[in-house]
Amino acid sequence: VTPFGRVRDPRDPEQREETMPTAQPAIFNEMGEHQWYVHLSRTDGADLATIKGVIRDLRAACADQGINLVLGIGPKLLPDLTGDIPDDFQSFETIVSTDGSGREAKGTQEELLFWMTSPHKDRNWKTQWDARQALKGHMAVARETITFIYGASLDMTGFIDGTGNPQGEAAERAAAVVPDGQPGAGGSFINAQRWVHDLEAWEKMSVQEQEKVFGRTKPDSTRLEQQPDYSHLSHVELREGAVADATKPKRNEIVRRSTPYALHDGTVGLYFMAFCKTQAPLRERLRLMYGADGGVRDRLTDFSNPASGSFYFAPSVETLDAA
């Protein structure tokens, strides 16, 4: 019943909109200068009630501190938090190239991801630290990465990142959020990978060679008219009925929210975060990049490869509230 005494009709789109599941806002909010990624998995004797309590406290703390938080739940943990499980939610399995190069997309599937972004590195640190301490004896940190905004959304290679995203928030939501009425409605599938760049090898190439590898110009990210079959764009810019045929409509099905990182030992790269309303397009692009089904391998993998890879699901706000 509405506040005015009228019973809501779920078949009425105007009324249904009032109760549609809400995607986690931080997926689409403007990213802060500082990012913090923490991956965890349960330890022996983990208490589910404690984990749920820490998740609630973390959400409240981030809201209080002005931190954008995305919570990603792995395939093993999600059924313990909710019965609303999206279709075709798989673990990240290592993908190995078949061309004898030894290149692979490494799978390191974990159970829980915190992604925090804000202008305040100190607040990010304190908030994630408190959550980790509260989870001791229940979940262990598998890996963490601190990233940042580099220039005008640049990758460490000097190329603009995220050019291929759907244009506008409405288009991004249409691509990234499970539609109302489907299992997992309001949620989003995540591909989280830490890519490691070989910048020394990359910088030995001319700009023209680099542009052929990406399939875009370096200064302004313009699509090259002639795409080499090994270009990155040829593997990830999927189009209706084709892969990189510019005459066909683009399959605007992925929202990228990636940032670069630099570790104290000189390791640099990109923390790749992609959101999608189904998981299949995320898996499809990875298989294409590594030529796993007999195609030409993406030459970008000669200069960058993932040290980790996990698939998660970011449940709706309502699902998290009920967990």
Q: What does each model-identified segment do?
A:
Residues 8-19:
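Short, Lys/Arg-enriched N-terminal segments with co-localized hydrophobic residues
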Residues 19-323:
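Long, histidine/aromatic-enriched segments associated with O2/redox biology
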